[in-house]
Design a protein with these regions (language model features):
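A hydrophobic, multi-pass inner-membrane permease signature
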Residues: 2-294
Length: 294
């Protein structure tokens, strides 16, 4: 029978634990502060007295959200953006990374394509030309302006390419000898063997689309077509009472713009908090597959 020796806590370990605990508190407290603010009474929030626990428990901010049709309209735009954007981006990532992962002697042009992508990552045409381009393509005030410009994120494409390189190329050659075409090889060999990596990049795309606000702010003027994060940004930066209905102004007097915005941030965070636990088990595995070389 073997017994494990207890390791003594050294000074170095204690320092590491303290630093990690402090980092955990720094990361967790902003979310906790937003949560308690959303449930606190406006008197305590405006006085700056809410720090650790909710004061004067109040759920009127969440009741106001349930009556805000524009909030749910913006959320529906974000949901559509996540579904369509992730589907388009993952498809583009897979079909672009696959031919670039093969050895250069099999596909000599891949070297030049990689340099072309790298140049696009390093140099940008600028915001104003890009804005004009969106207008010329009639994408201004169009849902697809949230999808098409970022349909192929180049950094994620490089990660996907490295993930595919971990699949032995001998499998590709064996499948070719057996009569499989490139599409069959991709979707029956590479994709199933790269599920953790694909799930990892899917999480990146999901968070990116859900948290995106700048494109909606720049290219969409119609509030009914803007995504949720743009809607919340507009509320947090500018609160225009001239465009609000009388019942909204009365509700704002009973709550607070701070508590209302905090409640909307909490509601907007829920989809990420719900999706992440299911993909977390793939996250570390997927990143290791692209980072470790033997």
């Amino acid at each position: 029978m073997t017994t494990k020796k207890k390791q003594k806590l050294t000074g170095g370990h204690a320092v590491i634990i303290i630093v990690l605990v402090l980092l955990a508190i720094i990361c967790f407290y902003p979310m906790w502060y937003t949560l308690i603010m959303s449930f606190s009474d406006k008197v305590y929030v405006d006085a700056g007295r809410t720090w650790l626990i909710p004061l004067g428990l109040n759920v009127k901010s969440y009741g106001k959200i349930l009556k805000d049709s524009l909030f749910f309209s913006a959320m529906w735009v974000s949901v559509k953006r996540v579904i369509v954007g992730c589907a388009v981006s993952m498809f583009m990532l897979i079909i672009t990374a696959y031919p670039l992962c093969v050895p250069e002697k099999k596909f000599p042009a891949s070297k030049y394509i990689k340099w072309f992508f790298l140049a696009n990552m390093m140099f940008s045409g600028g915001l104003i030309p890009f804005y004009s381009l969106m207008r010329q393509y009639n994408l201004f005030n169009n849902f697809w302006v949230l999808i098409l410009p970022g349909a192929l994120p180049l950094w994620n494409m490089i990660l996907m390419m490295n993930f595919f390189r971990n699949v032995p190329y001998a499998l590709n050659e064996s499948a070719t000898i057996d009569g499989a075409n490139p599409i069959q090889i991709l979707f029956k060999i590479y994709v199933p063997l790269s599920v953790p990596s694909i799930a990892c990049l899917f999480l990146f795309q999901f968070v990116g689309h859900w948290n995106g606000y700048l494109d909606g702010l720049l290219y969409i003027n119609d509030p009914a077509k803007q995504p949720l994060q743009t809607y919340i940004y507009n509320l947090s930066v500018t609160l225009d009472y001239s465009t609000m209905r009388s019942e909204d102004i009365i509700a704002m007097a009973q709550t607070s713009d701070k508590t209302l915005n905090a409640a909307k941030v909490i509601v907007a965070m829920l989809p990420i908090l719900c999706v992440y636990p299911f993909i977390q088990k793939y996250f570390t595995t997927g990143m290791n597959l692209g980072a470790v070389k033997e």
